[in-house]
Amino acid sequence: MSELTVVKFGGSLTENPQAQNKFLEELTLISKRQNIILVHGGGPEINALLEKFAITSRFVNGLRFTDADTLGVVELALSGKVNRVLTTGLIKNGANAVGISGKDGKSVICRQVEYLGFVGEPVKVNRKLIDILIKSRFLPVIASIAADVEGNIMNVNADTLAASIAVAFKAQKLIFLTDVAGVFDKNNNIIKEIKIKEINSLIEDKTITGGMIPKIKGCAESVKKGLKEVWIAEGISGIQKIKGTVIKK
């Protein structure tokens, strides 16, 4: 199996057991005929644990500041809960899933975004560990935690991590599964395909707004770096016959 797809499972989908179970069933089936790398975040679980431990988040320009206490909760939520749930679900469905994070085997090296605390931006993907897993017919399930060159643990945006891994492995496809069905035009219809040259004008005329802007820009960067297609799709609709918006060159 030479074809590789990287799938990013949106944290919000973990709140929908039906969608999550359907996704895990389908991903198991797909993993029988092609290589899969699954990357995940876990915003809702992080928020729930922060509330449980009475840790108040502060935000810088709309982004969560990750102090030492918050980082411990982030790692507990992502590696200790979400990763375990997804890995166990895949195994129950028959997949050879292995749960890791970006820090394991120094798989993802990042640099600190200092104004956000213990938050990292991926700068290098070391393929060795993930390659071993894939070649041994395992399905890596990767939590969005990484480390800098000195081994300091960092919270990493899961979208960015998935894109970095997809580019490093020259994946045929990168799929962002979210709680929205894709990118919509001003008539509320899904835009089926966006060329990267069209993105700036879609942002300028406010077709693409809010949190979709950084996601689309990240998709465009991935395509510029060699990916053939990047999808933004609704997780609840499944991935066997994926429907959503595809970004191409």
Curated annotation (Swiss-Prot):
Gene Ontology terms: cellular component: cytoplasm
Listed transmembrane segments: none
Catalytic activity of the protein: N-acetyl-L-glutamate + ATP = N-acetyl-L-glutamyl 5-phosphate + ADP
GO terms under biological process: arginine biosynthetic process via ornithine; L-arginine biosynthetic process
Site feature: Transition state stabilizer: K8, K215
EC number: 2.7.2.8
Compartment(s): Cytoplasm
Gene Ontology terms for molecular function: acetylglutamate kinase activity; ATP binding
Annotated metabolic or biological route of this protein: Amino-acid biosynthesis; L-arginine biosynthesis; N(2)-acetyl-L-ornithine from L-glutamate: step 2/4
Residues annotated for substrate binding in this entry: G42, G43, R64, N155
NCBIfam families linked: argB (TIGR00761)
PANTHER family associated with the record: N-ACETYLGLUTAMATE SYNTHASE (PTHR23342), N-ACETYLGLUTAMATE SYNTHASE, MITOCHONDRIAL (PTHR23342:SF0)
Protein family (similarity comment): Belongs to the acetylglutamate kinase family. ArgB subfamily.
This protein's name: Acetylglutamate kinase
Species whose genome carries this gene: Endomicrobium trichonymphae
